Amino acid sequence: MKKKPLSAKIVFMKITEKILIVDFGGQYNQLIARRVRDLNVYSDIVPASKALDYIRENKPIGIIFTGGPNSVYEEKAPLPPKEIFNLNIPILGICYGMQAMAHCLGGKVEKSLKREFGKTLTKFDTGIPLFKNIKDKSSVWMSHVDCVSRLPEGFVSAAQTANTKNAAMANKEKKLYGIQFHAEVEHSEEGQNIIKNFLYNVCGAKGDWNMKSFLAEAIKDVQNTVKDGKVLLALSGGVDSSVLAALLNRAVGKNLTCIFVDHGLMRKNEGDEVEAAFRDTPMNFIRVNAESRFLGKLKGVSDPEKKRKIIGEEFIRVFEEEAEKIGTVDFLAQGTIYADVVESGTKGSAVIKSHHNVGGLPDHISFKSLIEPLKTLFKDEIRNLGTELGLPDYLVHRQPFPGPGLAIRIMGEITEEKLDILREADAIWRSELEHADIKKDLSQYFAVLTSTKTVGVMGDFRTYDYTLALRAVKTSDFMSADWVRIPYEVLDKVSSRIINEVKGINRIVYDITSKPPATIEWE
């Protein structure tokens, strides 16, 4: 099949209520979108340069200006178009977004005499719609070096801290509001209530965004895009690909072929579990045993980015070969989600690591177009969508698993021996956590086989075996995460079982690093 340039199909949801989030480069932009959607209102993130185009096409009921790393008085600092303030659309500016609003409307922004970072006690004017029914004093999350020293005409100060006289500003008549703190961060006690007030009290939202409405529109959009074409999907059995498979099966039925590429890098028994879950469904299910092929390509490779690239490219090669066998294939479907796109780097941000679904793909593939119906959804939304689709709980709520599989949970070169060791150790870790009464406090947990060997003693013999790292985190959005305080008795039991039951490991360590500064995965 002749290679054709990649052409991405963008799915536009026909949702009646939308909030435009104007992106000024802040680190919490996706979190703002998540918070808005949690309140049943759809949101889109758009650069400031495209804000007016978006407004003309989508008619949002409200606008949120994000934070950002710049100072508004600097040359080339990003600013909203001034026309945006004359459209009679409610606007909420967050941190830099508040400063940008003040600057554009004639206020004054300058460096703060005292910078504010972290939790800060704040006093609120609860008489304004934005702060209705919240506590008049509560802690918020501050992160700023500049402040609004003079308010624009028509605005009043709506919140104060010990060091900031204008911690929030309000123009009730024009429905323009600014907050110097980050309401979207969990550390802001009344943050979600403030966002809710903006959506419902200020913008007049009714709340029509949910997975039921998304599913209905997504099916229509996929059908309109695909028509009578054939769709090929890589089915890993993870949450994302499983939900996507169910959605596409609902949309195009027999025109969907799901290829399960068993690259030999999966968790214990997972390959057979995936096949058992999907082989009897109406979709066309094909399992490809490609373990030796992948391990051959990965032989001698230790660099994690090279591993990801190799696995991504080999996945596509397998798809091309399978496509030749099954005939004409028009569309390649991918379970790309928001976090994949964010962590693979965008303009103006550093690349953290390439995701298998994004940076690991070659530039050209032998399909007409790429479709990514889940690209705008957060992980928890995808789980909710899976429930809406009727998928079994063990598929919807299974542990997140990266596309490259255990290849990025083994430090250094990948070998069959290391894979066998890690599978057994990881299975014990997951099993013990799932049987302990702490599962509700865990978002993701797994084992990592390090490349470090240490000296140990077992019986009368000296050992020189691998060190295993255990990881468990709690997160609501996977943009940030805290390590979980696992009870000592659980850690003790896990350590004892692994050392005694898994040959090749003689030392266990527990990862107590949050995200940031670390990522959840080790590679």
Curated annotation (Swiss-Prot):
Keyword Ligase annotated: yes
EC numbers: 6.3.5.2
CDD domains the UniProt entry points to: GATase1_GMP_Synthase, GMP_synthase_C
Highest taxon, organism lineage: Bacteria
Pathway: Purine metabolism; GMP biosynthesis; GMP from XMP (L-Gln route): step 1/1
SUPFAM superfamilies: Adenine nucleotide alpha hydrolases-like (SSF52402), Class I glutamine amidotransferase-like (SSF52317), GMP synthetase C-terminal dimerisation domain (SSF54810)
Residues annotated as domain Glutamine amidotransferase type-1: 18-208
Residues that hold ATP according to the record: S236, G237, G238, V239, D240, S241, S242
Coiled coil stretches, renumbered: none
Molecular function GO terms recorded: asparagine synthase (glutamine-hydrolyzing) activity; ATP binding; GMP synthase activity
Catalytic activity: XMP + L-glutamine + ATP + H2O = GMP + L-glutamate + AMP + diphosphate + 2 H(+)
The keyword Nucleotide-binding belongs to this UniProt entry's keyword annotation: yes
PANTHER family documented for this protein: GMP SYNTHASE [GLUTAMINE-HYDROLYZING], GMP SYNTHASE-RELATED
Biological role stated in the UniProt entry: Catalyzes the synthesis of GMP from XMP.
Protein name, per record: GMP synthase [glutamine-hydrolyzing]
